Structure formats: C-alpha cells, structure tokens
C-alpha cells in the first residue's frame, strides 16, 4: 500500500516520502497515529499544497523536544532510594516508571515511554546512566543515583 508520510518514521522515511508498506501496518498504525495518509491523487495534491505548513509544524515539534532535552540534561543526576541487601543488590528493581516519576519529581515532566534502559532494569545500588528519547531524533542523558534506604 502506497502512503505519504506526514512525520518522520524510524526505518521508513521522513516527511513527504511516498513509501510502500504492508496494508495492515498502514491501516492499524500509520494512519490512526496521524503519521501517514494513503497516496491517492487527491491526497498527493492536498499534501503538496500544505507541505510548507507541515514542515514548519514538524520544526516546531523538534525545537520543543530539543528544549525538553536541554532541561533533562541540566538535571545531571537524580537520586532514587530503594531497599537493598548488604551486597548492594536491590530487593526488586527500578524500571522505567520509577525513573520517569523521579525525573518528573525533580522538575522535568517525562513519560515512562521516553525512558531507555539499554541494559534492562536497574538492580544494583550505584550510579547508572539512563537515556531518554524525547523525539525520534532527540536524546538526553541523566545519571540515576540509586541509594539504599
């Protein structure tokens, strides 16, 4: 199925690209999320007429994401207290929700879906570097300091 992308989509393309995707992917994800429209003659003409407006909107979203990333980077470190054993192993773990709540409490609103834990959940006391994907192109880093209660 041919679609016109209205937003940058990972591993697919960016604004204005006409790409061929499976019908289910287009019907169930791209179109309902507002990331694409079917590539009919009418939609192609409509898109070309609004291209500058859509590019400006995309630039505004990117600028807002970069501003949020700067706020997150400015935090430098966030401390989370959790129960731990003698050897520094936590009872349980610290996941994306706990990290998002701690960063939000520190003053920057973050959704748990933006937290990236490349090595899985945090299970030990100490400092851990955590990435945040604020936008498809914008990343931020914060050091999470896990301390025993």
From Swiss-Prot:
GO terms for cellular component: ribonucleoprotein complex; ribosome. Pfam families: Ribosomal_L9_C (PF03948), Ribosomal_L9_N (PF01281). The keyword Ribonucleoprotein applies. InterPro entries: Ribosomal_bL9, Ribosomal_bL9/RNase_H1_N, Ribosomal_bL9_bac/chp, Ribosomal_bL9_C, Ribosomal_bL9_C_sf, Ribosomal_bL9_N, Ribosomal_bL9_N_sf. One of its GO terms (molecular function) is rRNA binding. The keyword Lyase does not apply. Keywords: Ribonucleoprotein, Ribosomal protein, RNA-binding, rRNA-binding. Signal peptide: none annotated. GO terms for biological process: translation. Belongs to the bacterial ribosomal protein bL9 family. Binds to the 23S rRNA. This is Large ribosomal subunit protein bL9. It comes from Klebsiella pneumoniae subsp. pneumoniae (strain ATCC 700721 / MGH 78578). The lineage of its organism: Bacteria, Pseudomonadati, Pseudomonadota, Gammaproteobacteria, Enterobacterales. The gene is rplI.
